[in-house]
Amino acid sequence: TYYGVNDLDTILDEALKNGYSISNTQIEYENTIFAFDIETSSFTEKPTKEDHNEKRSIMYVWQLAINGRVIIGRTWNEFLYLMNRIHDRCDLTDKHRIIIWVHNFSFEFQFIRKFFEWKKVFAIDNRKPIYGITINGFEFRCSYILTNYSLAKLSDQLHKYHVSKMVGDLDYSLVRTPLTPLTDKELQYCINDVLVVSAYIKECCEQEGNITRIPLTATGYCRRYVRHNCLYKGGKKHKEEQFNKYHTLMLSMQIQDVEEYKQLKRAFMGGFTHAAANYSSYTLENVDSIDFTSSYPYVMLSEKYPMERFNDYEDCSLDDILDMSEQYAFMYKLILVDVELKDPHNPMPALQYSKCTSCVNPIVDNGRILKAD
């Protein structure tokens, strides 16, 4: 089921009963969930003398979900009429706003950016805004940056309000315009796209308490946790105790002097980013590759790291290091004599030439030691 632009007032009558919440910055936000999306067609036409860019793109349908009810339109004029009507009905101002979530806002932004006067647009890269605030109370946010999931994957994260992202029903090779009739399946594809986002945001609202508690990005949850547990701004006693405990821990790991810092720098080694010596300069066929997802946060939880200052350990032997390596981290200078790779085909030799203070007759491949006296 979907609605037309003329059904807006009826939908808002019900949606605006939820009232508004006030953020930490004293901005009032309507407790109404808006999700926006467009479908476009791209095509190529013969360039003119004035315009050498042959690629064109046109919006042929847009959809706006308001608390789970989806309004569909085919033209930008309909969209702008709808936005003006929402502005008037919600009495929007710079201090009283609605949040409109857009999955991959950077794409839609290129189509709507000239329709509004923007107070602030924050981008993480060139043409990659994650939110934009208009002067008349519309705050567009990127739900992809919030979740780090595609729409298909986002539907799998829903626990309470289950909506499936339809896959494969839109043939993107077809050129469609606002005059192109859409089938029921094509319309359902459009509807589900905004319903998935709406359902996810609704679950976030229920989990966080209200709409103002939802952060801008996925890392916002982590930053909030750190602020709550580590940074004290006065007030309740237990928060002061949390801060003191955290502050004491940080001080206990503080680097003691410049020499220790230099030693830590010498011990640090980066990742393997070069080609394996056995295959360098060759063209290989039928190869595959893999990458680790969220590797940094994973190793922060799965691996062990020093949580105390390094202290001198006199008369430390190799056996001591091997025996205690599960409980303690060691930092030391190692002297090796007559070293050679056990497996000459090892693609990742561990010894880095640049970290050696001296090296006798080394055989080096791309900064890694294969053999030395």
Residue ranges of model-derived segments:
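N-terminal accessory regions of nucleic-acid-interacting proteins
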Residues: 1-34, 38
